[in-house]
């Protein structure tokens, strides 16, 4: 029972997923701090007039309540930054490595098929010449005698 569970956990996909979750969590914290420290203050500076608190990115809904689109814009930028970095640092290299492995496997299969086909052709040629099939055929009996007569077309 535990051996099956161990095999399940040791598969490449589950280990890759665990690593991705840990790295993603750490990276999300880094990008969130970057967005909170740098991007959000820039958006707030551009979006909200500090004296009047009026902005196209802030909608007052009555009383002291307002819908602040600055926060939504910061979260969208945060998401885009995480998605871009994960794509370029994880997904793209992983797919390249995976395709490279598939290409090597394809070449190995192709070479194996070529060897089988060449062996079949060799055996068919040997059968049509009346010689036994196989790699170590005595070729002295199979070579034609040279024709030293002049050719008819000359």
From Swiss-Prot:
UniProt topology in membrane: Multi-pass membrane protein
Alphabetic keyword roster: Cell membrane, Ion channel, Ion transport, Membrane, Transmembrane, Transmembrane helix, Transport
Region Disordered, annotated ranges: 129-154
Family matches, as Pfam families: MscL (PF01741)
Compartments where found: Cell membrane
Keyword Ion transport attributed: yes
GO cellular component: plasma membrane
Coiled-coil zones: none
TM ranges: 12-32, 71-91
Residues making up the signal peptide according to the UniProt record: none
Domain of life per record: Bacteria
GO molecular function: mechanosensitive monoatomic ion channel activity
Gene3D superfamilies associated with the record: 1.20.5.220, Large-conductance mechanosensitive channel, MscL, domain 1
Homology family: Belongs to the MscL family.
HAMAP family given in the database record: MscL (MF_00115)
Quaternary structure note: Homopentamer.
Task performed by this protein: Channel that opens in response to stretch forces in the membrane lipid bilayer. May participate in the regulation of osmotic pressure changes within the cell.
Designated name of the protein: Large-conductance mechanosensitive channel
Lineage, broadest ranks: Bacteria, Bacillati, Actinomycetota, Actinomycetes, Mycobacteriales
UniProt gene name: mscL
């Amino acid at each position: 029972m535990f051996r099956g569970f161990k095999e399940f956990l040791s598969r490449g996909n589950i280990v890759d997923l665990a690593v991705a979750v840990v790295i993603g969590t750490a990276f999300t914290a880094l990008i969130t701090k970057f967005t909170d420290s740098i991007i959000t203050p820039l958006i707030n500076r551009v979006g909200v007039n500090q004296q009047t608190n009026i902005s196209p990115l802030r909608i007052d809904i009555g009383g002291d309540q307002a819908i602040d689109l600055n926060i939504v814009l910061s979260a969208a930028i945060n998401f885009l930054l995480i998605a871009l970095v994960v794509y370029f640092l994880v997904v793209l290299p992983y797919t390249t490595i995976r395709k490279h492995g598939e290409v090597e496997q394809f070449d190995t299969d192709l070479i194996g098929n070529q060897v089988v086909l060449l062996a079949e052709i060799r055996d068919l040629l040997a059968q049509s010449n009346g010689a036994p099939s196989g790699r170590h055929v005595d070729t002295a009996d199979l070579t034609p005698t040279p024709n030293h007569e002049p050719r008819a077309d000359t």
